[in-house]
Amino acid sequence: MSDKPNLEEVASFDKTKLKKTETQEKNPLPTKETIEQEKQAS
């Protein structure tokens, strides 16, 4: 491995080979209602 990037590889990279994926949030932020409920519960 060399420190310099191989620009030929980057230039010849075919974006159409990439699969389109659906992003799914693993850790969605809690809503304000959820936060209030947790504050009142403790």
Swiss-Prot record:
It is found in: Cytoplasm, Cytoskeleton. Residues 1-42 are annotated as: Disordered. The modification N-acetylserine is found at S2. Keywords: Acetylation, Actin-binding, Cytoplasm, Cytoskeleton. PROSITE patterns: THYMOSIN_B4 (PS00500). GO terms for molecular function: actin monomer binding. It comes from the Eukaryota. Residues 1-25, 33-42 have a biased composition (Basic and acidic residues). GO terms for cellular component: cytoplasm; cytoskeleton. Pfam families: Thymosin (PF01290). InterPro entries: Beta-thymosin (IPR001152), Beta-thymosin_sf (IPR038386). The keyword Disulfide bond does not apply. The keyword Cytoplasm applies. One of its GO terms (biological process) is actin filament organization. Belongs to the thymosin beta family. Plays an important role in the organization of the cytoskeleton. Binds to and sequesters actin monomers (G actin) and therefore inhibits actin polymerization. This is Thymosin beta-11.
